[in-house]
Amino acid sequence: MRFTRGLKASSSLRAKAIGRLTKLSTGAPNDQNSNGTTLDLITHTLPIFYSTNTSKIYTIPLTLSEWEVLTSLCVAIPTTLDLVETMLKEIIAPYFLETPRQRISDVLSSKFKLEQMRNPIELLTFQLTKFMIQACEQYPVLYENIGGIISTYFERVLKIFTIKQSGLLSLVGFINAFIQFPNSTELTKFTWKKLAKLVLRGSFLNEVDKILNSSATFTNDSIVQYYDAGNELSSAYLLELISRLQVSLISHLLNTSHVGANLSEFLLNQQYQFYKFDQEVADENDDTKCIDDFFFNVRSNKQFFTDMCKISLQFCSESHILDLSTDNRARFSFDTRAHYLQTLCLIPFIEDTESELFESFTNVVSESIDKFFLSDVVTPSLIKAIVASASLLNFFTEKLSLTLIRMFPLLVASPHITTETVNDVAKIFTTGLYPLNEDAIVSTIYSMNNLLAVSEDGSPVPVLRERQLTITSGKNIEKDYFPLRNSSASLDGTGALLGNTTVGQLSSHDVNSGATMTYHASLISNCVAATTTIASYYNTQSITALTISILTQKVNSMSKELDGVILNSLARLAPNTSLTEFSLLLKFFKSRTVIATKIDDSALLKNIIKAKCVISKELLARHFSSDLYFMYLHDLLDSIIASGEVERLEHHRPQTEISRVADQIATYLEPLAALLPVPGDTPLDINKDEVTTNKFRNAWFNFVIHGYHLGGPIVKRNFSFLLTIAYNSPPLASEFPANNKELSLEMNTILRRGSSNENIKQQKQQITEYFNTNIVQYRTTSSSKIMFLAAAVLLETIRCEAGDCSKTLLYFSDPSILSGSIEKCIAVLSVSMIRKYARLIQKGNDAIFNSKMIAQQLNNLLLCLSHREPTLQDAAFHACEIFIRSIPSSLCHHLSLYTLLDMLTALFDSILDSEAHKFEPRYEFKLKHSKTTILVPSSSSWRATTLSRLHKSAKEWVRILLNRSNQDTKILLQSYISDLGEYSRLNSVEFGVSFAMDMAGLILPADKELSRLTYYGPEKPNTISGFISLHSWRSKYLFDTAITSSPEDIKRQIGISTQNIRKNLTLGNKIITKDVTDFLDMATALLILGNGAPASLIYDIVHIPFEVFTSASLKIATNVWLTIITEKPEVAHLLLVEVCYCWMRSIDDNIGLYSRDHDLKGEEYQKMEYSPYDKAGINRDAKNASQAMQPHLHVIKFFASHFEGTLFQSDFLLKIFTKCALYGIKNLYKASLHPFARMIRHELLLFATLVLNASYKQGSKYMGRLSQEITNGALSWFKRPVAWPFGSNELKIKADLSVTRDLFLQLNKLSSLMSRHCGKDYKILNYFLASEIQQIQTWLTPTEKIEGADSNELTSDIVEATFAKDPTLAINLLQRCYSKKAEDVLVGLVAKHALMCVGSPSALDLFIKGSHLSSKKDLHATLYWAPVSPLKSINLFLPEWQGNSFILQFSIYSLESQDVNLAFFYVPQIVQCLRYDKTGYVERLILDTAKISVLFSHQIIWNMLANCYKDDEGIQEDEIKPTLDRIRERMVSSFSQSHRDFYEREFEFFDEVTGISGKLKPYIKKSKAEKKHKIDEEMSKIEVKPDVYLPSNPDGVVIDIDRKSGKPLQSHAKAPFMATFKIKKDVKDPLTGKNKEVEKWQAAIFKVGDDCRQDVLALQLISLFRTIWSSIGLDVYVFPYRVTATAPGCGVIDVLPNSVSRDMLGREAVNGLYEYFTSKFGNESTIEFQNARNNFVKSLAGYSVISYLLQFKDRHNGNIMYDDQGHCLHIDFGFIFDIVPGGIKFEAVPFKLTKEMVKVMGGSPQTPAYLDFEELCIKAYLAARPHVEAIIECVNPMLGSGLPCFKGHKTIRNLRARFQPQKTDHEAALYMKALIRKSYESIFTKGYDEFQRLTNGIPY
């Protein structure tokens, strides 16, 4: 019987209407009179309002309509206290008090009977009580009133219940209301106390049973109906309700509603959680607050809980309460005891373990175990309560622990307990095991195992012979223990409840009887369930492993049905195991599968499959993509692949074997399918999982080898499984995993497995249905390819059925498909799948073939259109064409259409990128909507061709769509344009948007009238205006939507935005552009709509972007300003004034263009570094510089645009613009000199010329001042030395050139005006501008002759005028327009006016080279000169200036004014200057600097040691040795104690390491293994002391040594070796540029017997070139690694990381360099190869130029390295300048450029990569030429060192000549181009490589 509160009887239309009216009338008191009137109309239909005697209201039978009114009133609680009190007094209380005796009309009574509802009296009482409870909860002041009503109610019930059954029915409804709604705590407590007193009176319960059993009035239909429904009215039922109310109240007080468990389980869990925290094993997810709240609630109600527990103990101790007279009463009695036990579980939380109450609780639980635990009549709730109570006690006492552990297996073995109950009880039992040691649970599991027993013949063993013997208390459970209060009232069959069959009797039965077998099956099922539940909930690896071990042993030892139970349980346990245990479990399943297959045990095999499916479902649902998941997936796939393994490949096999293996494979299909997502869900993502991808492919190959084909019986039987597998499978061939060796299909071992002739024939027939016989020629096509095609047909056809037809295209990306000549088959298959997909859509299910899934398929096809593989791209275009024409609606979806438009944008961006980053192209482009990344090859021609092709196809496809669904498509296009608003605000070109606009405006046949229009004229008409108006409406609608709030709300939001932005600025936080954009949009909207204060809004609209001062914020702001000026012209002047003010303030603040923070230092002043070319760092710094200056560019463009728009509008505006222009250009003297500042400067000057032109036309007084400031501002740029354009962004350089030309032309137009006001200054400016234009143009096209270039010869008067203007300008002008005559004039001017030039370091050379100087005094002015570069300063120590103290003093001053780290680099040069140090200046410099930098002192000492001897053996002393020894001794003696300790630690450590070479000498002729053993032995002895470092790595500290890294190097007489050290150092983060500490392993070579000083010099020069090129952002790559000479013939060399020499490649059998690249990076079409080739080109160009200039010889393959990124690196510089090995000049070529190098670049001098190499060589050469003197200054001091590479000053002459200083830049470019041509495959290069092969065995 249902206890329904919604009452079907009152669900009539009238009842619903009354309920609705009641809710409205008791709702919010907006119209109190109206509500009151309605309520009165409803309630006054009740008899209580019209009866003459309301005290007899119960005598009037309650009708259906009155019932509906009363229940409706009870549902709606009034919102006012007065109304509640009125209803309570007038209606609720009177009817409530009369419910015990209320009469019911026959109609109402019969309706309830028909509907099988409870008695109307019970339900009416329930509703009225619920009303009072909720009213008291809402208005606690009613507590006393309602409490009084309830007291009166109890009194009436006690009077009436013996007379009328309605009294008991009413009481049942009353109690149930409080059970369901204990929300009013105090009222529920009050009621519980009343009921407790009632039942404690034993007479009440006795009287109830007496009346029910004997009274004639209590035998009507209602009593029978309650009995039949299982709710027999009895004292047991009332007691159960009261006990349930008690539990409900406690649960409410403890707030257990969020848990969902019963009370005892909740209390047990809380104790467990507390235990975990106490033991410090709590999980991170555990909620401590819940535990704290729980204990707080317990403490708050302690006394009340104590009273409850005492009453519960009283009831539990009275055994006579148990009423077993009927099934229902027995159930109520046991449930009552369960509720009281749940209550008693509070005792451990409120009492000490020593208390009497706790002791009583323990006894009650013990007694319950003895009496009820194994009884066959108790309810599951009592069993759970007993187990929960005993488990809880385990946390506090061990008294019952042993009993519970012993009894639990017997409980599980009980024949009357269900498996469901066992599962529930086992969970509770497991929780109670945690405070015990692990032995307890092990013991329990073994006890379970003992129950799983079978006899020798496999029959079940009687496991319980005498149960009494195992019960700890020794008491017997007999039926006589339960006294029947009234046996005469027992129903038939009650005796069966008593379980009078003893265990002994059961044991004596025939073990093979049917009953026993049934019991045994139940026993096994329960034991397995309990064991697995315990293991999974205890969740420790040891217990899980034990459980699995026990259960696996039982398989095949019992019945087949029970095998299924055990296997199923093992499967459910599997996801909780470790990887190791799971692996063992899989092996078990595998072994059982083998056994089942071998003995043909289909039942066992079926059970195994079911168990595997359970594992699959569990892993899919709860552990998807976990390690366990993939282990199981791999196991299933491996099992499929291993099926049918053969020893001999390509061997014929019989059809019977093929069929048998096919059936074997089929057993794995269901578990595999269950493990994978079903079609329609997101498929398994294994795009980057090489192992899983290959396993899936091999599985499909094995399918077809063993007879799986479409239409075959085995495929039909397993089609649903194959469908899911196919849906998640990768394509059988693709570019992943990268198959660099291009292995053919013939090499796949699975495809080469033999098959039967019948299967091969069937597979051929299958593929013939797709491919005609011409494509698949049986005789020429191998069986491997046949099987591959068959597998592809099978997989892709089934995948198509699963809703995916797009994967076939990916086959073309695999080189083996193209090389295997089956690409035509794949093309046919691809088309077939698309056509099949189009057919399936018509009849497919919506889950797979809905519009989104169809659009997704097209989306996948569209993404292939940009693939670099031509065959795949062609197939993709063909596939898209068919797909869109077959299913036009597929493109009418934002997913596919947006992808198409985004791809157009991405490809257009890629073309821009190839211009902007010619030598460093982007390969990855992200589609803006889907965020999908597409890979684009570096070829600019490919990019342009692909865009053109896609654009053409896209037009056709969108035309088709517009003709089919014109309006829908245009709405999508509008959405696309609107969605990209954020991008388009910052990006100038969005090709996809442009395309969308074009297509939306087309007139198509869908436009019935316009398409038939006859038009004339050059332009076709379009519908773009209608589209734009619709789009404008849509934008306006969005705009209006954004401002639907009131102006006050918007103002408040604006205030919050400005406050947040300024707060973040103050705190130095990054400002998000969107925040600024949102603020500007809101403020502009408010301003334009006229709802705000204009002045205040304009102030913020202008000032905030300037305060944020980012490129994005100012770009958006300038657009907003122009919008305001257009839409709100009355405030335009106000806004312009504010912009002008902020512009000038930003100039005063020295930010943006007017900041010098990003200026580049001169190359010679920069810190030289031994590190790889850092293009990422260069780009980062360049980006920072550009972004810092861009804001001013946007403002300048705003000025220029608005100036042109308001020309001649007013004098006031002209004055404002003039003021802005003047302030900007007059401050250009302090503006940035970064290369990126040039264009912005010239934009400003162009704006100024516009203002000048306007002023000239209006005759303004500012003409003269503007002219002068323009000239001065323009000339301020040329104070920087001439430099090539920065970076490789040709678009930027071309724009720079364009702006400079525009400025030059604009000034020429104003030449008369400029000449009149500026005189020669204007002419000087013309020289500079012409030179600048030529410089930029030359850089863009160095080999093309520029008309009029180098024609501006300087005259003497121009030189003099420029010198008078600024000596620095004169020097820079000479550098640009050199002539000997002009130089002589300038030298004279510098000598004559030396003090004017002291601020210009570059003027010093001119000053000291004057031939007219006759005495020292003439050079006294040098003492005032600005410091020059460290190299120049060092060169002033050379003999030429040794006699001039002014020069020597200046050089000391100049060096000391520099950072010591700059001088650090030039230690070799400084040491060599000691040769000429007659005055001691150099010695003093060294000693003074050593005091400042201890690292400098160490480097000096090592270099001095290396220069003491002329020979490598340290025998022939150098004449400088005494000087070096003296200085070294003085230096060391001057060290402080800490410096001396550091010095001793460092040199001792280094001596220990280098000393290994000496200890290796006795092993020189021994094997490498013996040498290595000796090195490792010595390395193990070295102690790493604090702060020690390698001499080659002074900026890092050695923290560890790889003691086993020692490696002897090849040498005939010496013992060099290599070792690896762990270095800790600070490096720059490539992204942020900030220093971060890293630890890395660094290998170093300790060389003996070779003079390393030449290598040091060569690497110094390479580092200098690196700095020169990085200063202009040139895209070349060099790696000046570190070499330090530490003693005669000794040195430390850093090993290039991740590199291998070319000769080692030859030794490793790599045929050529190109083959190495393809094997390592993939074929030429891969992005990896293209990136590596790009790196190769850049590095080869850099080293080629250096090789020529420094004359690197001995360039055999042993001295050329290749790193893992494709860079070509040079090492070993023993032969440079004027020395060649052995005097043999085989290498009479500029540099090494072999055929294999050219092959990597494309194979010929016409390929793009080769042309890039040529261009980079030319630009690297041009960039180096202006720094020839710096390079010579680095070499000059070393000439006296005695190094063999020098031939005196001839070396310097030759070096200078290689720079071709006499040639123009254009001539020098042609010269370098000729050198490249000469080097390409020179016969000398080939001859030298052959010489090295013959003499040293170095391959080439």
From Swiss-Prot:
Domain PI3K/PI4K catalytic positions: 1617-1884
GO cellular component, as recorded: cytoplasm; mitochondrion; plasma membrane
Misc. remarks from the entry: Present with 846 molecules/cell in log phase SD medium.
UniProt record, GO biological process: autophagosome-lysosome fusion; autophagy of mitochondrion; cellular response to nitrogen starvation; cortical actin cytoskeleton organization; macroautophagy; microlipophagy; phosphatidylinositol phosphate biosynthetic process; phosphatidylinositol-mediated signaling
Modified residues (Phosphoserine): 459
Enzyme Commission code(s) on record: 2.7.1.67
SMART domains given in the database record: PI3Ka, PI3Kc
Catalytic loop as annotated region, ranges: 1751-1759
Family (UniProt): Belongs to the PI3/PI4-kinase family. Type III PI4K subfamily.
Keywords (A to Z) from UniProt: ATP-binding, Kinase, Nucleotide-binding, Phosphoprotein, Transferase
Positions of the UniProt region annotated as Pleckstrin homology (PH) domain conferring phosphoinositide binding specificity: 1531-1648
Catalyses which reaction(s): a 1,2-diacyl-sn-glycero-3-phospho-(1D-myo-inositol) + ATP = a 1,2-diacyl-sn-glycero-3-phospho-(1D-myo-inositol 4-phosphate) + ADP + H(+)
Species per Swiss-Prot/TrEMBL record: Saccharomyces cerevisiae (strain ATCC 204508 / S288c)
Name the UniProt record assigns to this protein: Phosphatidylinositol 4-kinase STT4
Lineage: Eukaryota, Fungi, Dikarya, Ascomycota, Saccharomycotina
GO molecular function, one term: 1-phosphatidylinositol 4-kinase activity
